[in-house]
Curated annotation (Swiss-Prot):
It is found in: Cytoplasm. GO terms for cellular component: cytosol. This is Thymidylate synthase. Pfam families: Thymidylat_synt. NCBIfam families: PRK01827.1-3 (NF002497), thym_sym (TIGR03284). Homodimer. The active site is at residue 142. GO terms for molecular function: thymidylate synthase activity. InterPro entries: Thymidate_synth/dCMP_Mease (IPR045097), Thymidate_synth/dCMP_Mease_dom (IPR023451), Thymidate_synth/dCMP_Mease_sf (IPR036926), Thymidylate_synthase (IPR000398). Pathway: Pyrimidine metabolism; dTTP biosynthesis.
Amino acid sequence: MRPYLDLLRDILDHGCPKGDRTGTGTLSVFGRMMRFDLSRGLPLVTTKKLHLPSIIHELLWFVSGSTNVRDLQRHGVTIWDEWADDNGELGPVYGRQWRNWNGAIDQLAGLVEQLRRNPGSRRLLVSAWNPSDLDAMALPPCHYAFQCHVADGRLSLMFQMRSADVFLGLPFNIAGYALLTHMLAQQTGYEPGELIWCGGDVHLYLNHLEQARLQLTREPYPPPTLKLARKPGSLFDYRYEDFVVEDYQAHPHIKAAVAV
């Protein structure tokens, strides 16, 4: 995860002070990219411990189409609680857009079908940015779209973020989309290729600066590996226990407040 550490350093060295919706304040840069070769391991940050169950359950929650945090809470995952209403609802966020766009289109099912039938297509896209639904969302999508690409028997995925909380959120996003790439590749008969991240407003909150500096003092460990324990019948049939992450060695967790 050297690219991630380089990004932290880039923001600390070149970021511009900027106000934000939460009132916390940020150091921000604009327009950045990172690439990860998934054949070399799973891109999990090792300079602080990540809570892997939250990453896996969040991805499965997105894929299921759910928008209610109670479906996460039953697995002990609380990362979305701050934005939910009294009934646990978040409005038409990621799961709704991926699985039921405008009440009619299952984008994920369509993507899998196209990967099987027309893998050379340049339209292998899924979007969560639905302008007609934005006002009803508890939080508009930060990672708003992803695109797949197939070449030389490998499936690669690029995802775009309009806003990237680099210390807290981005490590989860990178890991989650890496898992999704493995799932899509397995379901469609390819090897996992590259994971590519593109960020718009890429920032560190001002109350995360010391934590970022601490992370930069730590030497990263080799990346862990991912094995999928079985091949489910469809993209929508994966379970938590299907994801076997081996040799994840990491430095201790670093506590930081979420900007709501």
